[in-house]
Amino acid sequence: MSLRKINFVTGNVKKLEEVKAILKNFEVSNVDVDLDEFQGEPEFIAERKCREAVEAVKGPVLVEDTSLCFNAMGGLPGPYIKWFLKNLKPEGLHNMLAGFSDKTAYAQCIFAYTEGLGKPIHVFAGKCPGQIVAPRGDTAFGWDPCFQPDGFKETFGEMDKDVKNEISHRAKALELLKEYFQNN
């Protein structure tokens, strides 16, 4: 039986590595399409990105939108984390919560998948609760050094990649995608 082929539309090498590791029984290829940066709720953003990606690729596509949501700030920065991180770095994200006693947060990953043009878009969401801490560990992947998932003493930046790829928001969303593929 041949592997299901998935065109993952991303320009982020670290996301691609994680998706390939989690979907190891699938043939994941990367398609780098310059997608618009949409604003809105995460599910809306993922669906819009998927519609735009399928127009460019003309075949099955998978897109992702990731959020980091601070409970003390009503869910901000949320889907705009990319821009906050670019300007503030992990240290600045931690400092944003300096005036709040609530350091809890959740990482959220929304994947949107379609078989092709005119086909329905399927959305898969995963969440990982945790807290924002002073940065520790590997700084190579975004906000990983300042997010410590509940039940762990390590940040994503300190954690073994295999452990992270079992518990993360991305892993949870991709588990739902795998279930969809098994049933369709």
From Swiss-Prot:
Pfam families: Ham1p_like. The gene is hap-1. Belongs to the HAM1 NTPase family. ITP binds at residues 10-15, 49, 65-66, 82, 141-144, 164, 169-170. HAMAP family: HAM1_NTPase. This is Inosine triphosphate pyrophosphatase. Keywords: Cytoplasm, Hydrolase, Magnesium, Manganese, Metal-binding, Nucleotide metabolism, Nucleotide-binding. Gene3D superfamilies: 3.90.950.10.
